Amino acid sequence: MTVNYNLDVSSASIFSFLRLQLRWKGSIWKYLLKELFMFIIAFITVSSVYRSNLIIGEKTRKIWDNFAALFDQNMDFIPLTFMLGFFVTIIVRRWNDIFANLGWVENTAITVANYIRGTDDRTRMIRRNVIRYMVLAQVLVFRDCSIQVRKRFPTMESIVSAGFMLEHEKEALDNVQCGKLQKYFVPIQWSTGLLVDARAEGKIAADLLMNEIGKHIIEFRKMLALLSNYDWVPIPLAYPQVVFLAVRSYFFMALIARQSVLLDGKEPEQPSILYPTVPFVMSILQFIFVVGWMKVAESMINPLGEDDDDFECNYLLDRNLMIGLCIVDDNYNRTPSVEKDAFWCADVEPLYSVETAMIPKNPQIGSAANYDVKVDEEEVMMMPHMDDVDLFDFESTNNLIPRKTFSVISIQRPFGSRASLASRKRSMMFDQLRGRIAKKQHRSNMFQNSVSQASLHYFESQAPSEINLSTLEMTAPKRKSSTGKLGSMNVAEEQHKLSAEVLPIVIEEDEERSKMLEKDKNKNA
């Protein structure tokens, strides 16, 4: 009984809106027409009594106006939008959960057809009965939850007559002793028992495959259990009661509050016949929107019922049985022969119809993929991220950035040559980094502890074996280790720390300086 209207709203246009509003089956007009008609008659009746001098006098009308003003001022104390908003949200969530757990047998049927191999009658019966028992369990659950399925299968004999269950299976089901409790689990147990028999007979190649089929069957049972739980425990009765009562009480008070016409709390100086029509029309529109909103919740609160938009439970049972048996039996082992496809050794270029070939496509491209990052320099410098420079202890050489973690990436430009490192501008990021470091009070101490450039050339030209401890003590700043003595540090480690302290903020050397150092090394050698 589901109403399909997706074709009418395939495009956003005024005609789609009109086609949607003119539908009758499952529409708000069908749900609302009777109550709207009753409200209009009641409103006109009360309005006639209020404006008739024969029924009420002028003094009584004044009292009416006072009550109407009080009602109109205090009607907003009923939080209709708040109550309906939460109520409809809960109803829609339950509706979605029920729909997601109706139960579909395709996954189980495909697994059964692929894992239970064989074309003999015994194997075919096992495959068919596994699916039929699953649908039988669904019939038993739907029969107790859906009134439309209950009308289709009023007795257990009707299930046998419909072919979902055989006579000896009905006797076996009746012999199961579980008191007054439901026997939904019995067909599921039959299905899993057939899997064990098929594995024992060698029709299932491995235990892993049998377990895979069993997982699908158990998952199907979980869906039916959740469906039964939703039917067993509905929304607490007080919630729909208070919502439905609040909506109808609101419009009952509106019958009195919307009769008198007051402009800024006073009667209009020049009465007109059009004045009473304004509250009448606005009350009707409010009734359509608010009560229609409530009707949406009423129609969705039990989607397994008999409303126009409730689920097609009978169709689902028939479909699961026919599709499942077709997969495991009629379409078993009917795979087409493997041949070369139409795009073999060719570019894959699917075709379109003439009407759709010229429609532009929007391919999946990242939103930042076409952003052109402008780089003014010939090379990009890469360095590790420094979360907070202020936390660095510049008196410790362990916190200095090692030069090997920096990288220079050349920018390939179509025109022009690569500039030398000496003429290249420093990156703004490093300028900001130097500026922050320069603000620290440690900078003066760092420069005082640095050795001269000539000493640096000397250490770089000497072999590690020629550097003795006395030379290091003369040139390098004296620092105490954890034991307070410099002699506990080896020569190579001290030379590495000295080089790091000499150039704490120099990122890289230019090409001319590198050549000069190379010449000095060769001359000293």
Swiss-Prot record:
Primary location: membrane
Tell me the compartments it is located in. Cell membrane
A Gene Ontology molecular function term for this protein is:
chloride channel activity
Q: Among its keywords, does the record have Transmembrane?
A: yes
How this chain sits in the membrane, per its record, is: Multi-pass membrane protein
Q: Which InterPro entries match?
A: Bestrophin (IPR000615), Bestrophin-like (IPR021134)
Cell membrane among the record's keywords? yes
Q: Where is it found, in Gene Ontology cellular component terms?
A: chloride channel complex; plasma membrane
Pfam families associated with the record: Bestrophin
Q: Where are the transmembrane segments?
A: 36-56, 71-91, 237-257, 273-293
Q: Which family does it belong to?
A: Belongs to the anion channel-forming bestrophin (TC 1.A.46) family. Calcium-sensitive chloride channel subfamily.
Q: What does this protein do?
A: Forms chloride channels.
Name of the protein in its database record: Bestrophin homolog 15
